[in-house]
């Protein structure tokens, strides 16, 4: 059976490539990719000779003639599908190719070779619950559409993950604050790269964290406690303290943890908790 190998590639750290992925890339004759320059650079870092390989740009797989063209390659050559970074098909035009092949040619086998994922890396680093999970990919560039789109998930109990570009980050985070009133948010910048950095804040806070506006971002919203979104800022803080104490964390430690996480004074949280009793 003919096989299309779908290969996840590093999202920043080349050392995260697996031996299985390297072998697939080395053995293949045709590479379907987003940008041949990016893929060639990756192969060069992996010491894989690409002189005899054919590179096919997959940005326009929505056109049927290109999909038919891809099918012919897969039938006659060893083929791999890659993204510029991470998993092909996740916010990537390769999804059209995989979907079309599955629906049109049952004789072609889809084989996924696992690897790095910005989605999973951001989700795990956030510390938020991992299920239910809602992945939104890249959001609309238009502010009104963005707000309306996020509002449709306001009452959906889940952890929400999406990607954002640096030039839209601040506007998007302000929109998140407008839609989600008392939610913890994680921002992962340049995940797995040399200057990787993490930020947490709550949407009830007046200001955004001091974020280095360079690189690529993963945004994670904790929307698991939707019944508490209407709480005031102080009520929310008390609720968070109690939530930690319910799992055995001492009051002092809970206040210290939240103070560090939310850039507040632990003494203020301690006083706030006692005033609520």
Curated annotation (Swiss-Prot):
- Can you say where in the cell this protein is located? Cytoplasm
Family annotation (InterPro entries):
4pyrrol_Mease, 4pyrrol_Methylase_sf, 4pyrrole_Mease_sub1, 4pyrrole_Mease_sub2, rRNA_ssu_MeTfrase_I, SAM_MeTrfase_RsmI_CS
Q: Sorted alphabetically, which Pfam families does this protein's record hold? A: TP_methylase
Does Ubl conjugation appear among the keywords? Answer: no
Extract one GO molecular function annotation from the record: rRNA (cytosine-2'-O-)-methyltransferase activity
NCBIfam families per the record?
16S rRNA (cytidine(1402)-2'-O)-methyltransferase
Please identify the protein, giving its name as recorded: Ribosomal RNA small subunit methyltransferase I
